[in-house]
Amino acid sequence: MSTTTQRGAASGESEQTPLAVPLPPLVELQGLSVQFGNRKILLSLTASLRGRSIGLLGPNGAGKSTLINTLLGFYKPSAGSARVFGYDIGTEVRQIRGLVGYMPENDAFISKMSAVSFVQMMGELSGLPPSMALERAHEALFYVGLAEARYRQLGTYSLGMKQLAKLAQAIVHGPKLLILDEPTNGLDPSARQRMIRMIKDIRDGKEMRIVLCSHLLRDVEDTCDEVLILKRGRIAHYANLDEERRANKRFLELETYGANGDFTEAIEKLGCECAVTANRMKMILADGVETRDIFRLAAERQVRIRRMNFRRDSLEDIFLKAMEG
């Protein structure tokens, strides 16, 4: 079946427009539970995550790291199952690991190795031939901005440089999935912005999908299109941030002067939901209704709109609501 449409047939010209194709599931969880002895860490997680960049959020002890380690096959589920790119974590973990690049939260360097030797070694461990691993190591270190320092020993690196070296070793073999565990942890504001820019660049390149594990809401909000919030081993909330941002633009709050029942009735006839208190109105815009329509109705009825605000539910709002449950 063709994935394009043609226009301009009457003029003899053809314009091909690609149709949007949804991404295949990246991570599928089906009743996934993990237990160490009598201690239950993950409790019946069920979700299908398709985003290009997925954020894992939760307070310390929520189960984020356990979930990552389980998806990589380091922990075995006590119940349920999970798939990554369609591969079962119980029986096809080798295939999963071959597709993943992992940037751990904690350092795992050999301090007397140079950065280029370390990244080359990690490339070889990921299956690259030595000559290709060396070439890719240079490329990865240039990409993250460590070209001039690539022959220095890792033990001489600053915290920010070590984070960049960890990113380089995670991408050296060209994985399909990049797992980032607290990538901006301990970075100063300028180094954080640099890291965020690189994560966005990788995401927008569309060659790798990303799972970002962080306790910093701003990092997730800046880089992710889906968020899974964990609390005490359970899924507290799932949010598609793109949909949340679009939904925010449909919620309005007006401060008016001279508003009356006729104005409210006219808005409701457009299919909008309204709630009126004193000189304030809250409404949900119907599909196809724009703010200019509200201004037009106000002008026709001599109603002055003093202030108009869109609702702005931030990720912090979503997270705090999830933690209340």
For every predicted segment, state its role.
Residues L178-E182:
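Catalytic Walker B motif of ABC-type/P-loop ATPase nucleotide-binding domains
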